[in-house]
A protein has these predicted regions:
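Ribonuclease/tRNase effector modules and their secretory precursors
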Residues: 1-88
Length: 88
């Protein structure tokens, strides 16, 4: 996990590539917007980021805070990246 914003390391699941949005675009949005706390459909607390990427596309990003069992540094795991224009 080499990506980071501020104090957080960032990891990405494979499913974040579903809409063919690159990690750099997701990192840009995460670094330039304030997250909103949300609860996922699985009832897990998460952060929602919505904002324009470096190309002007508005993206929505959902990230979970992960606390490893071995007391390693917590990190954000991005589980969803999608252009908001695809939202019905």
């Amino acid at each position: 996990m080499s990506d980071d914003i501020g104090r957080w390391e960032i990891g990405f699941t494979q499913s974040t590539r579903r809409h063919r949005i690159g990690r750099a675009s997701a990192r840009h949005v995460m670094a330039s917007t304030e997250p909103t706390p949300v609860t996922t459909s699985s009832l897990v607390d998460a952060w929602l980021y919505v904002g324009p990427d470096e190309r002007g596309r508005e993206l929505e990003i959902i990230a979970l805070e992960v606390q490893p069992a071995d007391a390693a540094q917590p990190y954000l795991l991005v589980i969803h990246v999608m252009p908001t224009q695809l939202r019905g």
